[in-house]
């Protein structure tokens, strides 16, 4: 059914060992194949690499990187032996700064890895840390635990960060020239206790060439106060990425954000559209668990005596050609949103296209809505030519919110509970919210008038349509179902 309507909207990512980098990642959950639309980094074969050791009681002056005489800092080890495996032993370290000189190669990447069974923690404070470094430049205004600039063929694995204004930061700048920076990976890292800005962020400022083959996988970002920034964010000139298997929770702003059009990678001059490269694109966001994300208590969103509950679990803000699948999102202000916050009156590129959202489970989002798409007022850019299918939405206050959007398909979704099934923004023109919503199913909706018969079949009882999060209707709802451990976390958060 092709529809348009109006509703309500609340105003609102030495020993030797054999190293292998991961390649095309394919996951199958039931009938769901994730990542099949977007090409991932190819499998690389490396020669044996030298291990360089870093320890909190090491010494940068007299050490040589062996187990008997380790370096004291990651920065020294990476500068001395790029293209090696840097084994970081347990202990406390000060902030780390890495640059292009620390790059590896396709055959011999620089790998910064926690020693097996040990817990190295990088602290984002100015205090002296035995064996570590003191913060460089910026003091309280800029306390980054681990910063990487213009390096490529580099992987950070199993490192923890604590505190600071930023946890792990990667940036590309124009100093890198017109060659893409590729094969950047952040894996199995833990970021906690950020006070100020980002947990993990990749900012691609270089408009001349993209960051590509970016992987953020298996990380945990928690207990972060992000202000008006995000828990995990990628932004700017990024072409080809994978965000997978991360756990993002208990933070006071957006969980995972994929951004375009903020001016990071604008062309300074010339005939090209200045925003041509300033957009995250061609990526996959899958198998992440995002929960307890809310701007409640975040002063950046306090106005007129109340907090604007507008923190998304997963947000595409100006990105394009992205697949979002098999994620479990719960207890967020907004579960999953696809939009742009910029107006096409300012630039014709300001719209969101080519996003497919499928086989996700979104539950218990009480701030506003489970799934939302479109610019939030009448002048913002369209979400268009996107597809939202085979998702299961459970007990979200509003299940689906439609804003400025057109030519999108919403089908094969299962909506269970909630007060409102589908809500249309009162701040957008009716003719600017024309999409196809059909072939879905719903049960136990509080306001049954919010369900048009053209949307699909309405059932009176949730037991007829699902067993927990598992759909009982063939071809409807998510093929991905959270395991019992995740369901237990959800149930506890809902208490």
Residue ranges and their predicted role:
Residues 115-119, 152-163, 179-195, 210-225, ...:
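Right-handed parallel beta-helix
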Residues 30-33:
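C-terminal motif of bacterial Sec signal peptides marking the signal peptidase cleavage site
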Residues 1-11:
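N-terminal secretory signal peptides that target proteins for export/translocation
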Residues 44, 61, 84, 105-107, ...:
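Acidic, glycine- and Ser/Thr-rich low-complexity intrinsically disordered tracts
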Residues 95, 143-145, 167-169, 197-201, ...:
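Structural detector of coil-to-beta-strand junctions
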Residues 11-24:
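Sec-dependent N-terminal signal peptides
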Residues 56, 68-71, 103-166, 193-195:
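Right-handed parallel beta-helix/beta-spiral solenoid domain characteristic of secreted/periplasmic
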Residues 56-97, 105, 142-144, 470-475, ...:
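Acidic Gly/Asp/Thr-rich repetitive segments characteristic of extracellular carbohydrate-active
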